[in-house]
Structures are given as structure tokens and as C-alpha cells.
Curated annotation (Swiss-Prot):
GO molecular function: unfolded protein binding
Induction conditions: Induced late during sporulation by the sporulation-specific sigma factor sigma-K and negatively regulated by GerE.
Keyword Acyltransferase listed: no
Residue ranges crossing the lipid bilayer per the database entry: none
Species this protein is from: Bacillus subtilis (strain 168)
sHSP domain location: 34-143
Record-given protein name: Spore coat protein P
SUPFAM superfamilies in alphabetical order: HSP20-like chaperones
InterPro entries (alphabetical): A-crystallin/Hsp20_dom (IPR002068), HSP20-like_chaperone (IPR008978)
Pfam families assigned to the protein according to its UniProt record, in alphabetical order: HSP20
Length: 143
């Protein structure tokens, strides 16, 4: 066992213990909630072909009128919504699904413009597509 490495490791951990490191890490979620099935965000996939970027976002239980999509910058897309329960709370026996506000900012790998976004909500999936801004360089034989 290398006691010198252990001593250095302890020094490093003590530095973080004295700072606000763990407070900042746990700022948004308490340790006992790290593995909760409830989440106030959603998951998405990103695809590309030669001409378009495609984003598929899981939005179960979100109606179009409760959905907000906004381009914060050319590479940041804000998606907000509300997941509404199907039945009233007094009928609830067991609940595993999350209900309430959801929000996520998606970092886009390629720039987008608002007027080029095509958006459709279908069967609990939000489909977003926009054209790629790929530059083509002409080959000059004379060089």
C-alpha cells in the first residue's frame, strides 16, 4: 500500500471539504433524491443526415398548448412544458410517473434559426428538425 499517495489524496479531499464544493454539487438535488424516478426534465436524441438536424424529445403527457419552445441563442434551445395527470389526485392509489413542470436547455451542435425550425408533437414525442448549415468548398483543379 502506498501511504504517500493516500496522504496526498486525503489532502486533496480535505481541500474540497473546507470549500463550498459539496454545497454547490448538491445545490439542486439532495443526496437522497439522486436516484428518484421523478425528474423535472426529459430525455432526447439528436440525429443528423446530409441536410438536416433532427431532435426527438420524450414529452409524455404534455399537450401542445402547455409547451413552450424558444431559441435562446443560435445554439441553445429551451423546451418547457407541463405534464398533466390523466386522473384527479383523489383517485390516486400509486404514482410512479412525474407530473408537473419540465424544462431543459438543449445545446445544439450546429446553429439554428427560429424561422427554419420545423416542430411537431406526435404520440408523446416532440419532433424538431432544422437544416444543417454546411459549407461546401469547390475544388479548384488549377492549383
Amino acid at each position: 500500500m502506498d501511504f504517500e499517495k493516500i496522504r496526498k489524496w486525503l489532502e486533496i479531499t480535505n481541500e474540497y471539504k473546507q470549500s463550498d464544493f459539496w454545497t454547490n454539487v448538491l445545490k439542486y438535488k439532495a443526496p437522497e433524491h439522486f436516484f428518484d424516478s421523478e425528474a423535472s426534465t426529459f430525455v432526447y436524441d439528436f440525429y443528423q443526415d446530409e441536410e438536416y438536424n433532427f431532435i426527438i424529445v420524450e414529452m409524455p403527457g404534455v399537450y401542445e398548448e402547455e409547451l413552450t419552445i424558444r431559441l435562446l441563442s443560435k445554439t441553445q434551445l429551451l423546451i418547457k412544458g407541463t405534464i398533466t395527470p390523466v386522473f384527479p389526485a383523489e383517485m390516486e392509489v400509486l404514482r410512479e410517473r412525474y407530473y408537473g413542470e419540465i424544462e431543459r436547455i438543449i445545446q445544439l451542435p450546429e446553429a439554428a434559426e427560429t424561422h427554419l425550425l420545423q416542430i411537431q408533437l406526435l404520440n408523446g414525442l416532440l419532433h424538431i428538425s432544422y437544416p444543417r448549415q454546411v459549407e461546401t468548398v469547390a475544388f479548384n483543379k488549377g492549383l
